[in-house]
């Protein structure tokens, strides 16, 4: 297993390009199954989950054509099997997203129950109940979800999500795109990635309205056609590199991104003392060599502060002036990185869903282990400011969400290298 070795102390300075958003790319790839002709999706990040999704299509008999810029063309008409097998699904939760499109377009689907990150209990029952509301017959047996559309196809339905679910909203929205009649999704997720998926469905000739609000209305259409689409930038990658600049007292400009999808994070960075300038597709952060000030924050569904940026701000607070409280309201077990940061000398107390972080002047390099995707990013940030060397093990977690993290950080002046395990 690869490891990262980071020598702390370099002040980051420079410019980098932000990759496409994995959490938009995965549902958009799944939605290509709805089309009745070839679809091209561009700006895909080069990440394991994306390759797994493309491999899953290959397993179903679709042969995606990929160019060197990681643009992929998918022709769903060549599908041969409607089964998403366990060995691919187990490594990636998002494969549940093929369930809705397959039932809507082909009338049936068999999808293994998913695997993925070890955070909290992420149930798939909302996906199942939503499809049942549209008339699908569903059985869960032998670790597989087996779904069949009724005679004449799925029917539009009113569906209320009793908890806000991003993948649940996406799955039902995709199924509704080809259902007969109107579907109304209430208490829907409002994330920008949901909006990106809705824009993609509409680019294929769909009729989705209200994405980005908690009520989404979908008028089903007879067919969805070929389209060319570019995936939105990754707001979490954007935020992570901005925090990297902030913790090191540096200056970083991130390009090919969108400041409007990151407002809660930018506000907190300003509160921490950063100077921030933005353009249409870039953000520049300058700390002028200052140590950040500690901030209090509470994670909540979009447009509030994102849970996927929580760990990075614990790293910021760990070396900041003062004490900050971080309250996690989305996932349980999301402070696993704290115990690794203790090894580096961080002063963090966890009480239930709250982490109280008292900033120290300096962290010390130590061997640490990544436990999940965003936690691993926080260890990288802490290592950038720690005295001496930090060895981060199990970095396959990082590779699931960050494209070429060591190369991008090297471009900003970080002393970081990957070593084979």
Swiss-Prot record:
HAMAP family: MurA. GO terms for cellular component: cytoplasm. It comes from Pseudomonas putida (strain GB-1). The lineage of its organism: Bacteria, Pseudomonadati, Pseudomonadota, Gammaproteobacteria, Pseudomonadales. GO terms for molecular function: UDP-N-acetylglucosamine 1-carboxyvinyltransferase activity. CDD domains: UdpNAET. Cell wall formation. Adds enolpyruvyl to UDP-N-acetylglucosamine. The modification 2-(S-cysteinyl)pyruvic acid O-phosphothioketal is found at residue 117. It is an enzyme of class 2 (transferase). Signal peptide: none annotated. Belongs to the EPSP synthase family. MurA subfamily. The keyword Cell division applies. GO terms for biological process: cell division; cell wall organization; peptidoglycan biosynthetic process; regulation of cell shape; UDP-N-acetylgalactosamine biosynthetic process. Its EC number is 2.5.1.7. Pfam families: EPSP_synthase. Phosphoenolpyruvate binds at residues 22-23. The gene is murA. This is UDP-N-acetylglucosamine 1-carboxyvinyltransferase.
């Amino acid at each position: 297993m690869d490891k990262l070795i980071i020598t702390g102390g370099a002040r980051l300075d420079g410019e980098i390009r932000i990759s496409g958003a994995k959490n938009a790319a995965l549902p958009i790839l799944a939605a290509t199954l709805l089309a009745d002709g070839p679809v091209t999706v561009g700006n895909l990040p080069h990440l394991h989950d994306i390759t797994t999704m493309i491999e899953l299509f290959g397993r179903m008999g679709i042969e995606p054509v990929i160019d060197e810029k990681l643009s992929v063309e998918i022709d769903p008409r060549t599908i041969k099997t409607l089964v998403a097998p366990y060995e691919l699904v187990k490594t990636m939760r998002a494969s549940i997203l093929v369930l809705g499109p397959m039932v809507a377009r082909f009338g049936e689907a068999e999808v293994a129950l998913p695997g993925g990150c070890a955070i909290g209990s992420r149930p798939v029952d909302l996906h199942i109940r939503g499809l049942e509301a549209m008339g699908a017959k569903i059985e869960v047996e032998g670790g597989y979800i087996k779904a069949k559309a009724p005679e004449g196809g799925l029917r539009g339905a009113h569906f209320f999500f009793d908890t806000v679910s991003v993948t649940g909203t996406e799955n039902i929205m995709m199924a509704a795109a080809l259902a007969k009649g109107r579907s109304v999704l209430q208490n829907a997720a409002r994330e920008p990635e949901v909006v990106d998926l809705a824009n993609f469905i509409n680019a294929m000739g769909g009729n989705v309205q209200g994405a980005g609000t908690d009520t989404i209305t979908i008028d089903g259409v007879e067919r969805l056609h070929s389209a060319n689409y570019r995936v939105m930038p990754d707001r979490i990658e954007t935020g992570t590199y901005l925090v990297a600049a902030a913790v090191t007292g540096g200056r970083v400009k991130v390009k090919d991104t969108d400041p409007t999808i990151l407002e809660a994070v930018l506000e907190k960075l300003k509160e921490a003392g950063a100077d921030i300038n933005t353009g249409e597709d870039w953000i520049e952060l300058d700390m002028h060599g200052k140590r950040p000030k500690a901030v209090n924050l509470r994670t909540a569904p979009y447009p509030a502060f994102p849970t996927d940026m929580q760990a990075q701000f614990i790293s910021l607070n760990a070396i900041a002036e003062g004490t900050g409280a971080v309250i996690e309201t989305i996932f349980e077990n999301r402070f696993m990185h704290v115990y690794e940061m203790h090894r580096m000398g961080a002063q963090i107390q966890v009480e239930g869903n709250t982490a109280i972080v008292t900033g120290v002047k300096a962290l010390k390099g130590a061997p640490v282990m990544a436990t999940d995707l965003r936690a691993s990013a926080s260890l990288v940030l802490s290592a950038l400011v720690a005295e001496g060397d930090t060895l981060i093990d199990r970095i396959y977690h990082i590779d699931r969400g960050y494209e070429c993290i060591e190369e991008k950080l090297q471009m900003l002046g970080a002393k970081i290298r990957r070593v084979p395990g």
